[in-house]
């Protein structure tokens, strides 16, 4: 069971950021109620200072907007926060009685058996297509990738190298944590993590067509995949 201090403090966010350095979710290998517990404990979106928390927060926010989260999880404790219960997830807030009464009055004026207009048919088709697309996206697998990126020499500006790497943006690609690793003779290489949607991003293609060609190859000599794990 994971445990965190107050997540609205710098120390709490730092611990959560370290926890998510090598994880996509709070516990397990899919989004669960543990993620919702931590998500709701945050009073506001994390700043970009906490790279891993920001990546996780945006991912969970997107999941909640699209399809929700149903996995049970293995348990998490957040200081000052209560665990998410079945009732909290399943029970919507009660509607205002006045609003409900007004809606019921409005319903009396609606012709429930009128013919469907062309606009209504088109809207229904668009909704069906949207549901189908979101279902397909939900089923698509994801992978966590650790890449090893080497500069040309010790004079290469590693800050600009990382900026050039992160400038690659595409649907299904999410950059994560990074660090500089000494190689020798004053040279350092970049280790950087990313999460990809398998159906949308090919790491091999990205390396061949973007990371090792102009203008990024001004800084990058070579790029290798150190670890590739299905999520």
Curated annotation (Swiss-Prot):
GO terms for molecular function: translation elongation factor activity. The modification N-acetylalanine is found at residue 2. Disulfide bonds: none annotated. InterPro entries: eEF-1beta-like_sf, EF1B_bsu/dsu, EF1B_bsu/dsu_GNE, Glutathione-S-Trfase_C_sf, Transl_elong_EF1B/ribsomal_bS6, Transl_elong_EF1B_B/D_CS. Belongs to the EF-1-beta/EF-1-delta family. The keyword Heme does not apply. Keywords: Acetylation, Elongation factor, Protein biosynthesis. The keyword Metal-binding does not apply. Residues 102-118 have a biased composition (Acidic residues). Residues 82-136 are annotated as: Disordered. EF-1 is composed of 4 subunits: alpha, beta (1B-alpha=beta'), delta (1B-beta), and gamma (1B-gamma). EF-1-beta and EF-1-delta stimulate the exchange of GDP bound to EF-1-alpha to GTP. Residues 11-73 form the GST C-terminal domain. This is Elongation factor 1-delta 2. Residues 119-129 have a biased composition (Basic and acidic residues).
């Amino acid at each position: 069971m994971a445990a965190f201090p107050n997540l609205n403090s710098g120390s709490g966010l730092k611990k959560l950021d370290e926890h998510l350095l090598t994880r996509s979710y709070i516990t397990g290998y899919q989004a669960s109620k543990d993620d919702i517990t931590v998500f709701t404990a945050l009073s506001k979106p994390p700043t970009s200072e906490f790279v891993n928390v920001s990546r996780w927060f945006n991912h969970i926010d997107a999941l909640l907007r699209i399809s929700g989260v149903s996995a049970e999880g293995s348990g998490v404790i957040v200081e000052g926060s209560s665990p998410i219960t079945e009732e909290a997830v399943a029970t919507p807030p009660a509607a205002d009685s006045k609003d409900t009464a007004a809606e019921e009055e409005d319903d009396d004026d609606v012709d429930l058996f009128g013919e469907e207009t062309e606009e209504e048919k088109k809207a229904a088709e668009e909704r069906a297509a949207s549901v189908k697309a979101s279902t397909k996206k939900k089923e698509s697998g994801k992978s966590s990738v650790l890449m090893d990126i080497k500069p040309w020499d010790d004079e290469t500006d590693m800050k600009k190298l990382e900026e050039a790497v992160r400038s690659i943006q595409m649907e299904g690609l999410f950059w994560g944590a990074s660090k500089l690793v000494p190689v020798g003779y004053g040279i350092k290489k970049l280790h950087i993590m990313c999460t990809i949607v398998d159906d949308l991003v090919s790491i091999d293609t990205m390396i061949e067509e973007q990371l090792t060609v102009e203008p990024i190859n001004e800084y990058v000599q070579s790029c290798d995949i150190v670890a590739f794990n299905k999520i």
